[in-house]
Amino acid sequence: MASTRRALVIGTGTGGLASAAFLAKDGFDVLALDAGAEIGGYLAPFSQDGFVFDQGLHYVGACRPGQLVHELFQSLGVDAGELFRELDPDGFDLYRFPDLDVQVCRPLAAYRERLTALFPEETKGLRHFFGLLDGAARMHDALARGILGRPVLTDLVALTGVPALLQWSQRPLRELIEQSTSDERLRAVLAGQSGAWALPPSRVVGLAALLYMAHFSDGAFFPRGGGGGLRDALVHAAEAKGAQFRTRALVERIETERGRVTGVVLAGGERIEADIVVSAVDPTITLGRLVSASDLPTSLRRKAAVIEPSMATFQIWLGMRRDLRTYGLGAQNVWLYPSYDVEEGFSARFTGKLPPRPMLFLSPTSIKDPSGALAPEGSSSLVVLTYVPHARFRKWQSLPEAERGPAYAAYRDEIAQWMLKELDARYPGLVGDVVVQAYGTPLTAADQTRATAGAPFGPAMTLSQWGPKGFRTRTPVTGLYLAGSGVFGGGVAPCLLSGLAASFMAKLAPK
């Protein structure tokens, strides 16, 4: 492997940072480019008045020794045991419905027992659902060991459940839930993590949802220092192997010659030559704008043009001079559903209208990382999130933030008050002693990360877009590879894997 081979990485979110680190580890001369002023994409935090806020990271699974995320970081020379802190093992997720609270615990067997105690008449259906979920967990672990080159004989056991699981690669999660129980409340509980993949149960691929849930089958973790801590660990790992980074470097075009990548051209005309280019931005941008149409099959161009993005978010970042643990929050995520109709919380995505009451997600980041890095002593940082239709903000998207005017500010404030009213109804008195109150709309996400339609999870994991119908690491252009949430899905682990896959493919590329 010649160390003189130049690799360029476009975008420095989790997938781009992982690509840079693995490519540098494999001996490439790496330069990672980001169009923004700061490295990290959704991992890049912002700070105000001593409070530090995450834009997109809430928890990570498979962080124990021998598990996927732990081993990926270890392979890069990062002490994963030091980086990650476990969330509450008895309830890393709390689902709060109108008259029912359910804490998601580890391991899967304990969570199944908890639900069986709550719903004793649904034992058979829970056995069916958790049988598939347990099979997905075994498949997840077997795939992880295979990817890491450490398969074991017992992985063959996971293969016995493949036929039963594979049918759910063609069927939505809602069908599995309805097949398992007719109890309205239990159906809502089994769909409680839907916000994590930003789709209602009727739209998300069943197997994709099962694998996501399985990723947290042995608990959930949060990085010390939040998203910024995770970003810094990846940056340091890449730089330790010689990788370099440039900000304010907007790639305008990926150049090719005879079907092979030759470099990129930046806004302003600067050309940077390369043997390998890994694009870790949305595939619709890479394949729809950066690569010449003549270099791609018509079918792939059409696919990139019609991809449905994941749902956009509206976030409220709160910094408060109070300890939220005294108000009932802990080292966990909280999902607040206004009813047992989980579908309703996502209806805005498809109707363009907001529901009467929002589904809310709470992330008390300063409790998840009690080191003091995210909030001053005696204070707390809190992220409050809901999903909104990007279409409601489209008329302002072409304008710079400073020029969006009072109508945009008024609509932004209206949604924030709608969310805070619901939060106060569910957690009376939680918000107070406020020092920082900032908002992030779908346009904020697009401004800061250039996410298509402000979507934080890349292409939606629907039946027509996930798995074999999704995008691949390899492209028809020799030397051009994809990484990021558009390859294996959103979240830390899929994006880390996308970087590993891009590096692996780059090593195999003809010189």
Please place each PLM-identified region on the residue numbering.
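Helical element adjacent to the flavin cofactor pocket in flavoenzyme catalytic cores
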Residues: 210-261, 265-267
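N-terminal glycine-rich phosphate/pyrophosphate-binding loop and immediately adjacent elements
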Residues: 3-138, 459-461
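Mid-domain catalytic core of redox enzymes
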Residues: 252-376
